[in-house]
A protein has these predicted regions:
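Gly/Pro-rich active-site loop or hairpin
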Residues: 6, 30, 66-71, 106, ...
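Active-site acidic/histidine proton-transfer and metal-coordination neighborhood
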Residues: 3-4, 42-46, 60-162, 172
Length: 252
């Protein structure tokens, strides 16, 4: 249960938890009002906050906000709105935006236009939340780089739209994470940390000391979220979470 995850993370020492809006824990369509309240109680009882939420963009229904099918786009936007409502229930300030993907037979120009329209609608629905655009180069093909994020932010141009990035995706592109931090500056609202193969920070090649310094330089005020440990089946989640926490605490 999600409540048990919250208890374990709080016991390790985490300040917050990022909740993915996916089955079995937090898929909006499967959550009763009692289940939502139970998670709220677990957060309060354990002194931990919901830092952010991420819709489940792949698998199942798909939820491609850049789909050529207007019905699929509408369903995807509706899903984001449901997750925005969950953010409000659980006090999460940030909703991540995965910009979808350009499918075979459609142009990049059209896919970009559709994701822009979707982002605009979501941002208008949730002016009280930060909508953080994530470049997902290893998983999709539309918002692939820091330049893409900046272009989409500038185009939609809403005050509650910001940026985020994942160190794993910068590795995939052979880029330097600190370049993203300095380029995005005050527009950087959230960050995912992971090392090679989704290992915990400190286990691979990412220079986290420089990342922390860069975040200080730009006066970053958001959370450091771990997106780790799902690269293989024989993973012990508590061990991954503890190693990530202890390493980051040692360099902050």
């Amino acid at each position: 249960p999600l409540e048990e995850v919250i208890r374990r993370l709080a016991r390790i020492g985490y300040d917050g938890i990022e909740i993915g809006a996916a089955a079995p824990h937090a898929y909006p369509d499967y959550l009763t009002s009692d289940a939502i309240k139970s998670v709220s109680r677990a957060l309060d009882d354990n002194g931990i906050v919901c830092s952010s939420m991420l819709p489940a963009p792949g698998g199942g229904a798909g939820f491609n906000v850049a789909s050529a099918n207007p019905l699929e786009r509408a369903a995807a936007v509706d899903q984001y709105k449901k997750v925005a409502d969950l953010c409000r229930e659980w006090g999460a300030p940030t909703l991540m935006y995965i910009a979808g993907w350009q499918i075979f037979g459609t142009s990049r120009k059209d896919a970009w236009s559709w994701t822009s329209e979707s982002l605009n609608e979501i941002a208008e629905f949730a002016p009280d939340l930060t909508i953080a655009i994530e470049p997902t180069s290893s998983d999709s093909n539309l918002i692939d780089s820091c330049d893409d994020v900046i272009e989409l932010m500038d185009q939609v141009d809403k005050p509650n739209i910001g940026a985020m990035f994942d160190t794993f995706h910068t590795l995939y592109r052979n880029e330097v994470p600190t370049d993203y931090i300095y380029r995005l500056g005050k527009r950087l609202k959230h960050i995912h940390l992971a090392d090679l193969d989704r290992g915990p920070p400190g286990s691979g090649v990412v220079d986290y000391v420089s990342i922390i310094q860069a975040l200080r330089d730009v006066e970053y005020g958001g959370y450091l979220a771990m997106e780790i440990g799902f690269n293989r089946r024989n993973v012990e989640p508590d061990d991954m979470a503890r190693r990530a926490h202890d390493y980051l605490r040692s360099i902050i």
